[in-house]
Amino acid sequence: MVMLIMLVSLIIIYRKLKIGERGSRKMEVLLVHINFSVYLGWISIATIANITAFLVDIDWNGFGISPAIWTVSVMSVGIVLALLFIYLHKDIFYALVVDWAFLGIYLKRTAPGTEAVLLVISAAIIGMIIISVAIVLAIIKKRVYVIRKSEL
């Protein structure tokens, strides 16, 4: 419950700061916007992880769908969120957090002594590629809230 309150609070702050919108001063962007983007990204990922852990803890059967399919479905939500933040808010920093989380999933699933679930490993790799390409394209097209054409 605390994570959900934090998530909602950060979403409200993010919107009030107008992250990704024009008119922000460079120092405000560097010192405030980027930090809130990263923080919101981590709280988003942590909320998803905590909900997943809770469902596992209560032995939720996932409506009979395999855990690997559920994992990939949840990872897909992460990909969609990252892409939405890139394209709606020009926010690559939120997306970088999701990319980093996918790297963590990949590293954990490929570590010695860990059950390697090929579907989850593949989803992590594909997710990192999709998000990374979207980030690079946003940078190339100068669709990043840190880069303003007037400052180039």
Give residue ranges: language-model regions.
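Alpha-helical transmembrane segments of multi-pass integral membrane proteins
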Residues: V2-R15, V32-N50
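Alpha-helical transmembrane segments and their membrane-interface exit regions
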Residues: L4-R15, F102-I105, G127-V133
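Membrane-interface capping segments at transmembrane-helix boundaries
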Residues: R15-G20, I135-E151
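Membrane-interface helix termini and inter-helical loops of multi-pass transporters
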Residues: E21-R25, A53-I65, T110-T114
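A loop-to-helix transmembrane entry motif
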Residues: V32-L40, W60-V74
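Membrane-interface transmembrane-helix boundary segments in multi-pass integral membrane proteins
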Residues: G64-V80, L107-V133
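Membrane-helix interface "capping/anchor" motifs
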Residues: L83-L96
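Central hydrophobic cores of alpha-helical transmembrane segments
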Residues: F93-I105
